[in-house]
Design a protein with these regions (language model features):
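Hydrophobic alpha-helical transmembrane segments of integral membrane proteins
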Residues: 68, 252, 269-270
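Juxtamembrane boundary at the C-terminal end of a transmembrane helix
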Residues: 276-279
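Interfacial loop-to-transmembrane junctions
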Residues: 244-266
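Transmembrane alpha-helix interface/packing and boundary motifs in multi-pass membrane proteins
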Residues: 227-231, 253
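Re-entrant/interfacial helical elements at transmembrane boundaries that shape
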Residues: 166-168, 243-247, 269, 274
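Membrane-embedded alpha-helical bundles of polytopic integral membrane proteins
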Residues: 2-226
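Transmembrane alpha-helical segments of integral membrane proteins
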Residues: 102, 234-250
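Alpha-helical transmembrane segments that form the membrane-embedded catalytic/substrate-binding core
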Residues: 19, 162-163, 182-194, 232-235, ...
Length: 279
């Protein structure tokens, strides 16, 4: 029985590695295409956000109610496509709220108010937070893609580091009631790995694009690496609570070994805004 379990764990690890490589390839292509068609980042983030919200609504159990599903997905799709447009963004927020309130009244006897609140609140959070990744390209044309890469990989490196370290030496459970596989050793390992790789990312960016001519604060990068590692865990555990509450293992199965789009971007929901405000 133990060998079977170990075999399944190895298989899951291989799936995670292969899927992770695919995601990295997609991000690399996204970065390259960004220089040809800058608006491509907004389109990609809109599709990612809409998919994540669709999975979220499905997990809560409201997918069959189109009056909740369609406005939520449409809102998630629209916001990244109208960045830096405060007026139209506010109109979109207002219309989404009106649709959700109207749907709540219409389905009052059929749907739990708690479920509606989860869908509405998390749709606002996920959409607004992931939209910060789209907004990063307006911050500084010279370094905007570094911010985007850092927002994505700071979350993923910490998660991957924690997973692999925890898989090999993890003994003490971090939050067994929320995420049984997460360990203290994994969290510490992810923290250290994230700091090291974020500093390496800054070094390579300076070396490749500027011939080491920029003045890089490695202390700042180390702090960013440490803080984002912690925020990554917070994001992961927060969305794990939702999955636990609705008795689902993953939000979806779009990415083998990782789950759905929401599973892959749950940490980015917290890390993205941090990178954006600390640009």
């Amino acid at each position: 029985m133990q060998s079977v379990t170990e075999g399944l764990e190895v298989s899951d690890m291989i799936k995670r590695i292969l899927s992770g490589c695919l995601v990295i390839g997609i991000v690399a292509a996204m970065i390259g295409f960004q220089f040809i068609f800058p608006y491509s980042l907004n389109i990609i983030m809109a599709l990612i956000t809409a998919t994540a919200v669709f999975e979220l609504v499905s997990a809560v159990g409201l997918r069959k109610y189109l009056t909740f599903l369609l406005p939520s997905v449409a809102f998630a799709l629209a916001i990244p496509l109208i960045p830096n447009q405060m007026y139209w963004s506010m109109v979109t927020y207002f219309l989404y709220t009106i649709f959700m309130l109207g749907s709540t009244i219409y389905h009052y006897k059929k749907v739990k108010f708690q479920d509606i609140c989860v869908v509405y609140g998390m749709t606002l959070l996920v959409t607004t937070a992931l939209n910060t990744v789209s907004l990063m390209r307006y911050l500084n044309p010279q370094h905007c893609m570094l911010y985007v890469v850092m927002a994505l990989f700071a979350a993923w490196i910490a998660d991957a580091g924690a997973y692999f370290v925890g898989s090999f030496i993890g003994k003490h459970k971090l939050c067994p009631n929320i995420s049984p596989k997460k360990t203290v050793e994994g969290a510490v390992g992810g923290f250290i790995i994230n700091i090291g790789l974020i500093m390496l990312m800054g070094y390579l960016y300076n070396l490749i694009f500027y011939g080491s001519q920029l003045s890089v604060s490695y202390l700042s990068l180390a702090i960013i690496g440490g803080v984002t590692a912690i925020l990554s865990i917070v994001g992961d555990l927060s969305f794990s609570i939702i999955k636990r509450s609705y008795d689902v293992k993953d939000f979806g199965n779009l990415i083998p070994g990782h789950g759905g789009m929401m599973d892959r971007f749950d940490s980015v929901v917290i890390v993205g805004p941090f990178i954006y405000v600390n640009k």
